[in-house]
């Protein structure tokens, strides 16, 4: 039984590692996959699992970008150190809207929108948004082509877009990438800032979910701990590849393919929801 659970954990880790960074909603995909492949765990654990599993993906960002994000990295010039601290300040500023808005409202949105139909609608809405924005920006030159040129004001408004991801199916990376592009950032800058913003956002969110799990009187069994560790380690390994793949992809392509994917998947899920309610 535990062996089967660990195999499922590996599968969920792969899903998380791929969908956390592509703008197609990792939490939405995990919830959808669990319609067909279920871990034999209680509801409280699964609610925590769907979020904390993202830590593996976040650690992959730290590993890949450690030198760039570390202001104490040996060999950095004073100017590079200053730019690194400025980057972290921009990330901190971008976190403010989520702290003020998303954290207090998270439980309410999870209770009312953490279902297949709202997820499907969110997939379609943001899929259409990606297609519209990419078409609109085809002839426009981005104003922000380097992270060092991003203003603190722009960082704050990107953080405001991140708040939209409180709705399951939206995609945190999708919301911030869309916001960054709308605000004049290049696709490369949008993707990079999304990666960096994920570090404090998801560490904080995962920490709150884990804390709530234990405050509510729940305890991790050994099998649950193994499932969580295996899924997180798998998400970490897969993310190492997917992050590099996406950074290479956005240098030559736009996000249209992800918009189309979201629309197709969302439409299929609506059809599935209708049939499920009828039969």
Curated annotation (Swiss-Prot):
Reaction it catalyzes: di-trans,octa-cis-undecaprenyl diphosphate + H2O = di-trans,octa-cis-undecaprenyl phosphate + phosphate + H(+)
The extra comment attached to this record reads:
Bacitracin is thought to be involved in the inhibition of peptidoglycan synthesis by sequestering undecaprenyl diphosphate, thereby reducing the pool of lipid carrier available.
> Topology in the membrane?
Multi-pass membrane protein
One Pfam family hit: BacA
Q: What does this protein do?
A: Catalyzes the dephosphorylation of undecaprenyl diphosphate (UPP). Confers resistance to bacitracin.
Indicate the transmembrane segments per the record. 2-22, 44-64, 85-105, 113-133, 163-183, 188-208, 225-245, 255-275
| GN (gene name) | uppP
GO-annotated biological processes:
cell wall organization; peptidoglycan biosynthetic process; regulation of cell shape; response to antibiotic
Q: What does the UniProt keyword field contain? A: Antibiotic resistance, Cell membrane, Cell shape, Cell wall biogenesis/degradation, Hydrolase, Membrane, Peptidoglycan synthesis, Transmembrane, Transmembrane helix
Report the superkingdom from the record.
Bacteria
In its UniProt record, a GO molecular function of this protein is: undecaprenyl-diphosphatase activity
Q: Which family does it belong to?
A: Belongs to the UppP family.
Task: Please state the Enzyme Commission number of this protein.
Answer: 3.6.1.27
Q: What is its main location?
A: membrane
Task: Quote the protein name from its UniProt record.
Answer: Undecaprenyl-diphosphatase
What's any one GO cellular component for it? plasma membrane
Q: Where in the cell is it found?
A: Cell membrane
- Record's keyword annotation contains Transmembrane: yes
């Amino acid at each position: 039984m535990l062996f089967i659970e660990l195999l499922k954990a590996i599968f969920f880790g792969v899903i998380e590692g791929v969908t956390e960074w592509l703008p197609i909603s990792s939490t939405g995909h995990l919830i959808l996959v669990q319609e067909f492949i279920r871990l034999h765990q209680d509801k409280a654990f699964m609610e925590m699992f769907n979020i904390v599993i993202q830590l593996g993906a976040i650690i992959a960002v730290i590993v890949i970008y450690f030198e760039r994000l570390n202001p104490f990295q040996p060999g950095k010039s004073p100017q590079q150190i200053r730019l690194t601290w400025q980057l972290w300040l921009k990330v901190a500023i971008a976190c403010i809207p989520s702290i003020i808005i998303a954290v207090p409202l998270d439980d309410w949105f999870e209770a009312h929108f953490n279902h297949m139909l709202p997820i499907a609608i969110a997939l379609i809405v943001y899929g259409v948004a990606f297609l519209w924005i990419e078409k609109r920006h085809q002839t426009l030159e981005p104003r922000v082509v380097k992270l060092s040129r991003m203003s603190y004001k722009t960082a704050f408004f990107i953080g405001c877009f991140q708040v939209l991801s409180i709705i399951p199916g939206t995609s945190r990376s999708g919301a911030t990438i869309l916001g960054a592009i709308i605000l004049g950032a290049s696709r490369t800058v949008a993707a990079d800032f999304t990666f960096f913003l994920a570090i404090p956002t998801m560490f904080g969110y995962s920490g709150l979910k884990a804390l709530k799990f234990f405050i509510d009187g729940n305890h991790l069994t050994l099998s649950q701990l193994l499932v969580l560790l295996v899924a997180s380690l798998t998400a970490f390994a897969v993310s190492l590849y997917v992050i590099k793949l996406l950074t290479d992809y956005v240098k030559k392509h736009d996000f249209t393919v992800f918009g189309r994917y979201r629309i197709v998947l969302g439409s299929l899920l609506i059809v599935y929801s209708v049939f499920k309610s009828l039969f």
